[in-house]
UniProtKB/Swiss-Prot annotation:
<feature type="glycosylation site" description="N-linked (GlcNAc...) asparagine">
    <location>
        <position position="662"/>
    </location>
</feature>
<dbReference type="InterPro" id="IPR000209">
    <property type="entry name" value="Peptidase_S8/S53_dom"/>
</dbReference>
<keyword id="KW-0645">Protease</keyword>
<comment type="function">
    <text>Serine protease. Has a substrate preference for the hydrophobic residues Phe and Ala and the basic residue Asp in the P1 position, and for Asp, Leu or Ala in the P1' position. May play a role in the degradation of structural proteins in the extracellular matrix of cells located above sites of lateral root formation and thus facilitate lateral root emergence.</text>
</comment>
<dbReference type="InterPro" id="IPR034197">
    <property type="entry name" value="Peptidases_S8_3"/>
</dbReference>
<feature type="domain" description="Peptidase S8">
    <location>
        <begin position="120"/>
        <end position="628"/>
    </location>
</feature>
<comment type="similarity">
    <text>Belongs to the peptidase S8 family.</text>
</comment>
<feature type="glycosylation site" description="N-linked (GlcNAc...) asparagine">
    <location>
        <position position="211"/>
    </location>
</feature>
<dbReference type="GO" id="GO:0006508">
    <property type="term" value="P:proteolysis"/>
</dbReference>
<keyword id="KW-0134">Cell wall</keyword>
<dbReference type="InterPro" id="IPR010259">
    <property type="entry name" value="S8pro/Inhibitor_I9"/>
</dbReference>
<dbReference type="Pfam" id="PF00082">
    <property type="entry name" value="Peptidase_S8"/>
</dbReference>
<feature type="domain" description="Inhibitor I9">
    <location>
        <begin position="31"/>
        <end position="116"/>
    </location>
</feature>
<dbReference type="InterPro" id="IPR036852">
    <property type="entry name" value="Peptidase_S8/S53_dom_sf"/>
</dbReference>
<dbReference type="InterPro" id="IPR045051">
    <property type="entry name" value="SBT"/>
</dbReference>
<dbReference type="GO" id="GO:0010102">
    <property type="term" value="P:lateral root morphogenesis"/>
</dbReference>
<dbReference type="Pfam" id="PF05922">
    <property type="entry name" value="Inhibitor_I9"/>
</dbReference>
Length: 772
């Protein structure tokens, strides 16, 4: 089915009304993005050329408003460099009329989006006890030297040692960016932090007038400094969090140059970033000369032409810029993954082999290991009464609110001097401890639910606290209910290394299958995203709560926002090592060398001790030292993506405008399963068989590869040919994968397997995902 302009707009309005989050966004704002696709600039983009584009935007909108002056007042962004479009204050009827214009690809509301280390690089094998072996990708890729990594986030704290420029040479001459500090004299860039910009007009269109404190790329949240330093922070020795996790903090490409694009601001109804600002930042980062763009934010899955991150990523890919995105923090439910365009690298989150342990010791002598980064501790070996928080319920509070330890839900008379057991969920984990402390409680135990299982997060609690697995939480609750005077002690936090099993998928990590394009497996890869230590801001506390007076220059945070920049840093290394490789080749190297095994070894598990699937980890857990020498890659170009969009239902005229060139869809249209992706997904094996085509390119020495297949349950897989002989670098070979339902098959739903090409030196693995 083709998506016409009218249908696309009506579909978007339907999605808006289906989502309460988007209802709030559209009620707060009558601002829209009008997207025309790509520019047709020839050669260097001059100021005059950009001014001419801006004038055409005023003329275009003026033709609808009846006044060029009104159009000029309405437009608050003109995208004039690589992305062609504008953001403006429009009413719904006018937006709908504009969407019908043949030159318009899409019109969509200025939607709100969400923001989605000392040990992690050791865990990934780039170093061992601060020693960098010759096999490390760091050595082979010169630590990412002079690659430019841009970060779309909450800005940057420029004073952080992670962004010092000692030992760096001149800024690369190809860099065109600026340090936008005209209204913040305290903000300075250098040879490491080579650029910083801020974009807040879309945010202002949604929330109203902003004061002068918003006119700076300075990070007042901490998220942006953390993600940027994870991707490319310098080596900073002696870093710890309240004495825990001591070591040298560093990013994946520590010798890369970095640029911060501030697009996220104080939350409004839980959302921090807006489409109009995100598009403006992409347009700037592409023009400025970024090699890698890291994007730890996203929204609800939607049509690619109505998705600011997908649009910006496509225009970046046209300029051979690698774009890495977080998968989202809406797990463990299926089909929650965001940022699912095939021209993006989408990253899930998993644990590493370090934990910040804090034990709960009960009066019966039982010990239960939890995790915490509390900055205070109970007196040594002193026990206190322990009780379920629901039994400390305030008179006017609900039992559920008390169970969750919401602010104001606890009776101080019942709480004083006790350790309270609070249920994880709904309100913030640190906020729960705050509620206990305000009630006079001495400590807190945070109970996991069945859904969060073994997923433990070390938080900087404001009182002695620890978080327990669901199994241990049940045992503690049973002790409390069966003991006349239950007592307990919480031990101080400590750092434990070599944890097994690791990695484990984080329960919050969003999962596939993609609801936008189920033929593409998303996420693509997983990386460390739990309790990652990296740079922070000096402006707020480690909990980001106003009641917390503590300040840290480094912090431990969890989320796919943290795993995303790990892959961004690795992409930076590969860009340094192989500057001519396409973004697709870099993604392929990362995916096909990943592992699906933990350090026991056994299959990677989820937070409930079940075997995880590719819908959680994609191709697997990243292995950077193997990614630098993948042997073969699955490559893709812009034409491949455009043909994919044709097959997805977009019409040729839309796609031509989107790409900036006249484009004719291939005839016949390609099968969606035949996009040359490093994974193979057949979302509906209803016919007798499906044949999938793939092409691999040799990026190593001449070699003979043979294939091995692990069949998904109930599916027989044949590969033709079964061997590929490569005689030179750059040589390409095509093979077919035939998938057939097995006779007598009883399997239903999704099943999983793998296809591996090997020459005994390289192992080029692709996951196979089939729905029966």
């Amino acid at each position: 089915m083709k998506l016409t302009h009218n249908f696309s707009f009506l579909l978007l309005l339907l999605l808006v009304h289906m989502s309460s989050k988007h209802i709030l966004a559209s009620k707060d704002s009558s601002s829209y993005v009008v997207y025309f696709g790509a520019h047709s600039h020839v050669g260097e983009i001059t100021e005059d050329a950009m001014d001419r584009v801006k004038e055409t935007h005023y003329d275009f909108l003026g033709s609808f408003t009846g006044s060029r002056e009104r159009a000029t007042d309405a437009i608050f962004y003109s995208y004039t460099k690589h992305i062609n479009g504008f953001a403006a204050h429009l009413d719904h009827d006018l937006a709908y009329e504009i969407s019908k214009h043949p030159e318009v690809v899409s019109v969509f509301p200025n939607k709100a989006l969400k923001l989605h280390t000392t040990r992690s690089w050791d865990f990934l094998g780039l170093e061992h006890n601060s020693y960098v072996p010759s096999s490390s990708i760091w050595r082979k890729a010169r630590f990412g030297e002079d690659t430019i990594i841009a970060n779309l986030d909450t800005g940057v704290w420029p004073e952080s040692k992670s962004f010092r420029d000692e030992g760096l040479g001149p800024i690369p001459s190809r860099w065109k960016g600026i340090c936008q500090n005209q209204k913040d004299a305290t903000f300075h860039c250098n040879r490491k932090l080579i650029g910083a910009r801020y974009f807040n007009k879309g945010y202002a269109a949604a929330v109203g007038h902003l004061n002068s404190s918003f006119d700076s790329p300075r990070d007042l949240d901490g998220h942006g400094s953390h993600t940027l330093s994870t991707a490319a922070g310098d080596f900073v020795p002696g870093v710890s969090i309240f004495g825990q996790g001591n070591g040298t903090a560093k990013g994946g490409s520590p010798r890369a140059r970095v640029a911060a694009y501030k697009v996220c601001w104080p939350p409004v109804k839980g959302n921090e970033c807006y489409d109009a600002d995100v598009l403006a930042a992409f347009d700037a980062a592409i023009h400025d000369g970024a090699d890698v763009i890291s994007v730890s934010l996203g929204g609800e899955p939607t049509s690619f032409f109505n998705d600011s991150v997908a649009i910006g990523s496509f225009h970046a890919a046209k300029k051979r810029i690698v774009v890495v995105c977080s998968a989202g923090n809406s797990g463990p439910a299926d089909s929650t993954v965001s940022n699912v365009a095939p021209w993006q690298i989408t990253v899930g989150a998993s644990t590493m082999d370090r934990e910040f342990a804090s034990n709960l010791v009960l009066g019966n002598g039982k010990h239960y290991k939890g995790q915490s980064l509390s900055s205070t501790a109970l007196p040594h070996a002193k026990f206190y009464p322990i009780m379920a928080s629901v039994n400390a319920k305030a008179k006017n509070a609900s039992a559920l609110d008390a169970q969750l330890c919401k602010l104001g839900s606890l009776d101080p008379i019942k709480t004083k001097g006790k350790i309270l057991v609070c249920l994880r969920g709904q309100n913030g984990r640190v906020e729960k401890g705050r509620a206990v402390a305000l009630g006079g409680g001495i400590g807190m135990v945070l109970e996991n639910t069945y859904v969060t299982g073994n997923d433990l997060l070390a938080d900087p609690h404001v009182l002695p606290a620890t978080q327990l697995t669901s199994k241990d939480s049940f045992a503690v609750s049973r002790y409390i209910s069966q003991t006349k005077k239950p007592i307990a002690h919480i031990t101080p936090s400590r750092t434990d290394l070599g944890l097994k099993p690791a990695p484990v998928m984080a329960s919050f990590s969003s999962k596939g299958p993609s609801i936008v394009a189920p033929q593409i497996l998303k996420p693509d890869i997983t990386a460390p995203g739990v309790s990652v230590i990296a740079a922070y801001t000096g402006a707020v506390s480690p909990t980001n709560e106003q009641f917390d007076p503590r300040r840290l220059l480094f912090n431990a945070i969890s989320g796919t926002s943290m795993s995303c920049p790990h892959i961004s840093g690795i992409a930076g290394l590969l860009k340094t090592r192989y500057p001519s490789w396409s973004p697709a080749a870099i993604r392929s190297a990362i995916m096909t060398t990943a592992t699906i095994m933990d350090d026991i070894p056994g299959p990677i598990q989820n937070a409930t001790n079940m075997k995880a699937t590719p819908f959680s980890f994609g191709a697997g857990h990243v292995q950077p030292n193997l990614a630098v020498n993948p042997g073969l890659v699955y490559d893709l170009g812009i034409k491949d993506y455009l043909n994919f969009l044709c097959s997805l239902g977009y019409n040729a005229s839309q796609i031509s405008v989107f790409s900036g060139n006249n484009f004719t869809c291939s005839s016949p249209k390609i099968s969606l399963v035949n996009l040359n992706y490093p994974s193979i997904t057949v979302p509906n094996l209803t016919s007798s068989k499906v044949t999938v085509s793939r092409t691999v390119k040799n990026v190593g020495r001449p070699s003979m590869y043979t294939v091995k297949v692990n069949n998904p349950q109930g599916v027989y897989v044949a590969v033709k040919p079964t061997s590929l002989n490569f005689t030179k670098v750059g040589e390409q070979k095509t093979f077919k994968v035939i998938l057939v339902k097995s006779k007598g098959n009883v399997a239903k739903g999704y099943v999983f397997g793998e296809l591996v090409w090997s020459d005994k030196k390289h192992r080029v693995r692709s996951p196979i995902v089939v729905k029966l």
